[in-house]
């Protein structure tokens, strides 16, 4: 709790209300909104999707009841692009987004446009990615696992027929095991629960949100609060039974809104 409050207070002191964030039906954006409201930040909110999208419906319901405003953008309604202009869009995506955008460089121009749009009036962009630190992201039981079994459960789930003869599956996953050992500074082949929890921020989050955050910093200052060490290290020790089904996460949002109700539904 204190780590979150202090972090967002620093944001308030540096950027006041010139801060933008998405709001959706997920835990993470709603938790950021709750913390921001607690420290006095009036977020400039946006949501992407169609009118029938659950994210849009939930976001609009939240802002209505909280007396806030939100910028709703349906990316699918962008005008159809002619062949002549499409070259420029692909080229812009290639250079602006380092060809690392989530949906690829072949889009309708909405990716770059919305990144610019959401930061026109703000100095800082916040992304709730990483909020899974408060949930059982790996969906594994509360026990030790060998690194091999961990990889098998979460990563070795592909159809390798798409690979050429140059791909050596055995070698690839042996290297993956060694990489996990290096990340966790261990020589053991078995991981305890805390080590498994660490792999979310130190492995998965690093190569997911790290890329997106780097791209966002081309358009404005951008932060991913739940990826910060002072956030995720404290989350490692939350009992796994509370992380299941979003029990802790839901109560944490309520706690930020109505301080004092944390754990009320966690018996």
What are these regions (language model features)?
Residues 1-191, 213-262:
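ATP-dependent adenylate-handling active sites, centered on carboxylate activation for C-N bond formation
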Residues 194-199, 222:
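The feature marks non-catalytic terminal segments
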Residues 197-211:
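Core structural elements
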């Amino acid at each position: 709790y204190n780590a979150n409050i202090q972090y967002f207070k620093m944001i308030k002191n540096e950027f006041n209300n010139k801060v933008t964030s998405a709001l959706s039906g997920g835990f993470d954006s709603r938790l950021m909104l709750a913390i921001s409201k607690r420290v006095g930040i009036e977020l400039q909110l946006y949501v992407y999707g169609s009118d029938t999208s659950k994210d849009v419906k939930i976001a609009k319901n939240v802002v209505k009841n909280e007396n806030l405003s939100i910028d709703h953008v349906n990316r699918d309604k962008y005008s159809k692009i002619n062949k002549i202009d499409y070259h420029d869009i692909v080229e812009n995506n290639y250079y602006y987004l380092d060809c690392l955008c989530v949906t690829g460089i072949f889009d309708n121009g909405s990716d770059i446009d919305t990144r610019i749009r959401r930061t026109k009036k703000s100095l800082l962009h916040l992304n709730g990615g990483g909020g899974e630190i408060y949930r059982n992201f790996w969906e594994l039981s509360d026990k030790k696992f060998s690194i091999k079994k961990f990889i098998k459960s979460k990563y070795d789930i592909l159809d390798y027929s798409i690979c050429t003869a140059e791909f050596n599956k055995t070698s690839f996953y042996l290297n993956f095991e060694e990489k996990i050992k290096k990340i966790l500074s261990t020589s053991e082949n078995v991981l305890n629960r805390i080590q498994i929890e660490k792999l979310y921020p130190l492995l998965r989050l690093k190569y997911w949100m790290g890329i997106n955050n780097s791209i966002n910093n081309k358009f404005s200052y951008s932060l991913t609060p739940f990826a910060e060490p002072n956030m995720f290290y404290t989350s490692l020790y939350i009992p796994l039974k509370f992380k299941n089904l979003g029990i802790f996460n839901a109560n944490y949002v309520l706690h930020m809104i109505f301080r004092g109700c944390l754990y009320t539904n966690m018996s």
